[in-house]
Structures are given as structure tokens and as C-alpha cells.
Amino acid sequence: MHISTIKTAGSSGMSHMNEAYSSTTATEMVARGAGSEIIHTEIDSNGSKELAPNGAQSRVQKPSEDAVRAPYDYIRTLPSKRIRETFIDALDSWLAVPAGSSTSIKSIIGMLHQSSLMLDDIEDDSTLRRGKPTAHTLFGTAQTINSANWVFVCAFEELRQLRGVDAATVFVEELKNLHCGQALDLHWKHHTYIPSVDEYLNMVDHKTGGLFRLCVRLMQGESSTSCHHIDAERFITLLGRYFQIRDDYQNLVSDEYTNQKGFCEDLDEGKISLPLIYCLAGSDPTQIMIKGILQHKRTGEMPLSMKKLILEKMRSGGALNATISLLKDLQDDILEELKSLELAFGSGNPMLELVLRRLWI
């Protein structure tokens, strides 16, 4: 069938309208004043729309998605521990989210995570992701950005499957938080600004905590239990901090991270990580020297000798020990908060505790 809409045209527009009206079996008109011209929108039998300007025979066919999704499909094939999916399953033992909603939330969180990885690798100028070439080195920077943006839209499309009345609001709030946190991280790197530990933690609460909060808030909105209102924000905040600080630490000392991303890759990208903040918390000659290295670093890998020098200063100056000490404190705080949640929900959650303990350093 034909559906007619209106666009502004010349003085003969009304005759076009009348002709369209008389020749169209089903017509929907949106009047915008005198002087208008018809554009026909055809809906075929399977519901897809094709545009035929001014009733012309040519139609705009739906484009293939092969190119736009190629970088996304590639990064999905890379090895993953699927921690976020397991985290959702563990929380579900408390929140009893309907199966369809749980599947949608996993899909939404997964798409947002993969999209952020593609963009992070571009912003960090990374060449390796989980031991494989990053998406933008294979498909090009522009195509990878476009694919990541498309995936964000797909995630919002999947959001419409949820029943929670506040789902869209929650989605927008936490994505704004995530991008604001990422902006701080990029700003500090660009200007070689060394933030305080409190500033750093605030950034992490937005950048890393945002996706965890989104996950929990969406699940609470879909929960079929009377416990959906229980406040888990402190638990999620601590978990987000642990994830990010653990990543900072492992990037410098883990052989697995070296194999997957390269030796001390955070130094290559100029990232202002927590160990680096601890290392530069002063103004002795060594700290001034390291700041100078960071300020004059150019795009690309930092020389291996410089990375080894900075890593040694982190060890000898106590920065790595301070980082691992904070991680141990966070582990204790997270387990304590887990016990509080178990009391609030009225049941234990051994699956969630197992997920957490697998992350411990």
C-alpha cells in the first residue's frame, strides 16, 4: 500500500496533493500549509519501507549490513572470559528476571562492552586486543568508529524489548556517565595531568562503574521479586573500582596481559593509571624525569628501555605495593558488602562470590 507524506514545494503543490489522494488506496497526510508535494513511502508485504520520491519507480532498498557490522563481528570472535554474562546470571538468582528480559540485558551489555572496546582501542592507539590485531588496524579507523556507533544504536533498539518504564532513562544516564568518565581519562592523558587518587576514583566510578550500574538497574527494573528496590550501589561502585585498578596493575606486571596487549601497554598509550599516580606523587628528581618522559612522548610505542625504567621506579618507590594493597582492601570491602546484600535479599549467593574470587589477585 502507499502512504503519502508532505514536503514543502511550489505553488502547484495542492494539485499534486489532490492527484496523490485520488490515486492512493490508503493515504496519511500531514498538512504543513499551502504549497506541498507528495513523497510516497511504500511498505511491502514483509513490512520493510522503500522510498519512491514523487511517486517515481526507483526505490531506496535497505542496504546490506555486512560492512557496518564487520568490525563488531570480528571483535566478538576474540577470546573472552564472559565475566559480565556470568555476573548477570549470578545476580539473577536474587532478582529473578524473566528469561526474555535477561537475554535482552545480556545482549545490551555485551553490545555496549564490545562497542566501547573498539573505541577504546582507537583512542588508546592500541594494536593488540586479547592477543589479536585490534579492529581498527584491520578495518580502518573510520569504519570501526562507524561500526561502534551502529552497535550503540542496536543496543538501544534491543532496549525496547524490556518492560521497565525507566529503562530508556537508565540507559541514557549511565551512558552519559560512562562517556564523561572516559573524557576525563582522555583529558588527563592528553595534557599529562596527574590527578589525585580521589579524582581518579571518581573517574573510575563513571567510566567503569557506569556499565555495571546500567546492568544492575536494568535488571532491577525487570525483576519479578519484591527485593528489586534493594540498594546495591556501593557494591557496584566497589566492584567497578576493583575491575579498573586490577586492570591497571595487571597491565604492568601480568605475563598474560603482556601476551595479549604487549609489555606495559598502558605506558605506550600514555595512560594515567593508579600505579603511575602513586609513582608521581611527589617532586623528587626521578618523578620529574618520568613526568618529562610522559610529556614528550609521541604517538606509538614507548622505547622498551624507558618502560623498564619507569616500571622499576614504580617497584622501588612503592607504587606497585600501594596498588596491590588497595586491591586487597577492596577485596575485603566487596566481600563485606556482599554479606550485607545477602542479608537484605534473605539468601546467599555462592555463584556471585565465586565470580568475585576468580578475579582476586
Curated annotation (Swiss-Prot):
The keyword Transit peptide does not apply. Isopentenyl diphosphate binds at K81, R84, H113, R130. It comes from the Eukaryota. Its EC number is 2.5.1.-, 2.5.1.1, 2.5.1.29, 2.5.1.10. Pfam families: polyprenyl_synt. Gene3D superfamilies: Farnesyl Diphosphate Synthase. GO terms for biological process: alcohol biosynthetic process; isoprenoid biosynthetic process; mycotoxin biosynthetic process. Dimethylallyl diphosphate binds at R129, K207, T208, Q244, N251, K261, K271. InterPro entries: Isoprenoid_synthase_dom_sf, Polyprenyl_synt, Polyprenyl_synt_CS. Mg(2+) 2 binds at D120, D124. Its cofactor is Mg(2+). Keywords: Magnesium, Metal-binding, Transferase. SUPFAM superfamilies: Terpenoid synthases. Belongs to the FPP/GGPP synthase family. Geranylgeranyl pyrophosphate synthase; part of the gene cluster 25 that mediates the biosynthesis of an isoprenoid secondary metabolite. This is Geranylgeranyl pyrophosphate synthase 3.
